[in-house]
Amino acid sequence: MFYVQKELASHEAVIVALFEEEQTSSFVQELDKAFEGQLQVLLEEKELSTKKKAISKVHSLGKTEVKRYYFVGLGKKESYTTETLRSALGKTFKTLQAAKVQDAAILLDSFVTKKLDAIDVAHIAAEVQGLGTYELQTYKSDKKDRVELEKFTAITAEDAQEIEAALTVGYVHGRATNSARTLVNMPPNVLTATKLAEYAVELAEKYDMDYKVLEKEEMEELGMGALLAVNQGSVEPPKMIALIYKGKEEWTDVIGFVGKGITYDTGGYSLKPREGMVGMKGDMGGAAAVLGAMEIIGELRPEQNVIAVIPSTDNVVSGTAFKPDDVITSMSGKTIEVLNTDAEGRLALADGITYAKKLGANYLIDVATLTGGVIVALGNHTTGAMTNNEELFEQVLEASMETDESIWQLPIFDRDKERVRNSKFADLNNSPGREGHAVMAGTFLSEFAEDTPWVHLDIAGTSESSGAHDLGPAGATGAMVRTLATLVERFGEE
């Protein structure tokens, strides 16, 4: 699908950058010769816009071998960022998709500045081509045919092999994010814990990873009372899923991902209202993020050791479901007083974190659609983070900045730990109250990470979008897939 050439040839469409202060760039001047000065006229009359994310289409009318040029406005160079580029190109690829373009090229060097080199642009272009044109997988009987972009050529003077490699990495990042989106969008009667485990096993086998899928009996033997409590009311068996990627000869410096895999959350006996229950099929967004990251890792084969652990079940109401006031014993041996059955994700993650440590994780990153509180605090575009290790957090933060997935750190204070430990009947309680809800959830998880370097990512606000945007349709976003994979790719770099 991806090609690299030094000269422009025949294409259905070509994408060209337009900066506010460089309306007469060498690229535009060269094209303007073929248009006999008409491009400059269009610029002067503001028919070609340099505003951020403005897309201006110009037909060549046979003056060149290219049928249509799409000029992408990027604003001023001083405010040009990777986020600007991602949004602008995402919108552009959506436009090409709507026009049913099958052969497109990009004048890569027209997007290059002192801040962004050709490799950066190539990676982002290939990545957002997949993200921007992703379509919701539906179960409608009337399926419409979809015209795909079949050929995408980067026109550049830079080294072809390096650009091809960047295009490949970007494509892999975009495709894996879309895999996660598809998982999150699946209905809960289709994506059960069993089906999620089957998906994970297929992924592991495809990329020659080791894997384990613990059944209920094995969980009982290991004392995973927290996950088992959440599963008590369900007819669907729970699964503790582990994928093991060995990128080094020795099993050291192991990065452990733990993804919340609650395939549907009614709230249990702490029942959600109807409005709060619709959409809870997406409560396994953390599991999807982890699996998407493992897809990238499987494709790119970084020299790191990684395990991905997913505690999975649904949380439903029945005569056997766990209840407020229950006291349960986690795999760690710590006892937990249940004050809220709708705070089930942290219970599943507690055993997931302990199991990841048992498998050898030296660093922990958990990902979960954990609290509504994080949405109140940070909105729908920023993931909440908590940590017990600033060095590890800085690496996660740097990865998120590279992928333009916004993260903001929330605190853990001793007084928060005291609230989580406040129980007359157990070591911990699972829900001290609504105040500081996102912080309470993360603080609870820190009790199981203990001294292992750990970062918690609450994607409740970022996992799904209520409306269409430049990088995709309404629905699942695939939040943190690219950040987790980038963390692994860059881990330990100075």
UniProtKB/Swiss-Prot annotation:
Gene3D superfamilies: Leucine Aminopeptidase, subunit E, domain 1 (3.40.220.10), Zn peptidases (3.40.630.10)
SUPFAM superfamilies reported in the protein's UniProt record: Macro domain-like (SSF52949), Zn-dependent exopeptidases (SSF53187)
Active site, UniProt feature: K272, R346
Compartments reported by the entry: Cytoplasm
Binding site for Mn(2+) 2: K260, D265, D283, E344
Cofactor binding comment, as recorded: Binds 2 manganese ions per subunit.
GO biological process annotation, one example: proteolysis
EC numbers on record: 3.4.11.1, 3.4.11.10
Pfam family, one: Peptidase_M17
Domain of life: Bacteria
Keyword vocabulary terms for this entry: Aminopeptidase, Cytoplasm, Hydrolase, Manganese, Metal-binding, Protease
Cofactor(s) needed for function: Mn(2+)
The keyword Signal belongs to this UniProt entry's keyword annotation: no
EC primary class: hydrolase
InterPro entries on file: Leucine_aapep/pepB, Macro_dom-like, Peptidase_M17_C, Peptidase_M17_leu_NH2_pept, Peptidase_M17_N
Residues that, per the record, bind Mn(2+) 1: D265, D342, E344
An annotated Gene Ontology molecular function: manganese ion binding
GO-annotated cellular components: cytoplasm
Function: Presumably involved in the processing and regular turnover of intracellular proteins. Catalyzes the removal of unsubstituted N-terminal amino acids from various peptides.
Family under the similarity heading: Belongs to the peptidase M17 family.
Protein name: Probable cytosol aminopeptidase
Species assigned in the record: Bacillus cereus (strain AH187)
UniProt lineage: Bacteria, Bacillati, Bacillota, Bacilli, Bacillales
Gene: pepA
